[in-house]
Structures are given as C-alpha cells and as structure tokens.
Amino acid sequence: MTAAGVLLLAGGGHSHALVLKRWAMRPEQRPKQSITLVNRSSTALYSGMVPGLIAGLYQRDELAIDLRQLCDQAGVAFMEAEITGLNPQDKCLLLRNRPELHFDWLSLDVGAVSRPSATGIPIKPLEASLAFLESEDPSDSEPLRVIGAGAAGLEVVLALRRRWPQRALQLQQRSGQLDPALQQLLQQAQIKVIDGDDSHSGPSLLCTGSQGPGWRPPVCRWIPMAGSGRIAASRWRGIPPCSPAATVR
C-alpha cells in the first residue's frame, strides 16, 4: 500500500476496532495516507458479551467500543453515516442521505444481519433487539419465543431466563435439532421447546443465522457474491475482481 490515495474503513466491526487500537499503540505501523472510518454510530457493541448484558451481568457501557475515541487516538478521521452500498467500478462507498465517498483502498468490516425466517425482531442489528427487550414487561403472561436453536438461540434464551426468572419462555427448533442433554437443560430452566414452524402471534426474537447486509446493485453486478448475501473473498480475504483495491472481512 503506497502513501498516496485514500483508505476507507467501512464499518466499525471488531477487526477494524482492533486495527485502530494497534495503530494507536504503534503509530509507526499506521499507513501514511488519509484514512477514514465510516460507521452508522460512534459506538459498537462487543457481541461476545451481549448474552451477559441480556442476563443482567454487564452494563451496556461495559460492552461499548468508542469508535470515535479510537479514531482520534489512531489519527484516523471518523464519519457517522449509514453505508447503503458499494460501487467498486467507480471506487465509491454509497451512504444514506450523504454524498458518496471516493476511495483508493477499501476495507470492509460491516458485520451481518439476522437471516429473516419468521415474524419477529432480529437479534442483529443488536441495538434494535436490545431496545425491544428493554421494552418488554417481565411480568407479561404472554410467552416470549426465541426462534432458532443454534448456539446463539440457546445463549439468548438462557440469558433471558436469568433476566426474567418468572416470564414464560419458548425456544423454537427444527424438529430433532437439540440433543437430549440440551432438552433436559431447557426443561430444568422451564423453557418450553417448540418443534418445527409452529405459528406464534406473540413477541419473538429471531436467532436464525446471519447473512450479509443486503446491499443491492451495483455491488452484485461488479463484486462476486457468496451464499447468504456475503461478498465472496479470496483466501487472502481480498475481493478477486477488485484486488488490490479492496479487502473484505
């Protein structure tokens, strides 16, 4: 990477946060060109601690990564804006209600969103799902259902049990997805397991896997897309048609 040109860091994910921290600690390793981080908010939540936040073990500020402060420490500009797409042919990042941003080099760390599979609140983006849980009444007699019995769904529903010891909780799985030991654990926690696609009109939280951010063309026209809406990358985490202009996480 030469000193000339503009490097854009698209998204405030964990990888970009760690890179900023490294540049702040070792400024001699920071590239010499103009660098800007673009993210929809000035803070990011560390997702690994979210079940603990839901359970009441942590306060929200303990999970918050201050991206603006990291940028200041690393000598990087920060722009608070929502990324809506990417035009790799013209080397432009598309933003909501803002002019597009030109780049010479681009690094993507935009995260993922929950895969839609039913009516409910997706666990990702985290800000919306956490606001939903804050709005819920722990004494409500209507069961809250977590849809998806993978690792995330299990963590979330068990965290909810600690948060709400008396609230009726359900976990919806594909038939036969959970092994007997997990079934027993959920039974002991008084969490009802629902098989299949049983309809549910009450409040629900989607933990149904993740997919890419759902960008529309020209991204899909100029960049190869992998499954679940993710951008295809080479073994070096680069985008083959755009290398070396972009790297991707």
Map each language-model feature to its residues:
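Conserved N-terminal Rossmann-fold NAD(P)-binding element of oxidoreductases
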Residues: 10-12, 108, 147-148
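Hydrophobic beta-strand scaffold positions of dinucleotide-using enzymes
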Residues: 35, 107, 203-205
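Short loop/edge segments at beta-strand edges and connector loops
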Residues: 79-82, 87, 173, 193-197
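FAD-binding core/adjacent interface of flavoenzyme oxidoreductases
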Residues: 2-3, 7, 73-143, 207
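Rossmann-like NAD(P)H-binding beta-loop-alpha module
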Residues: 131-167
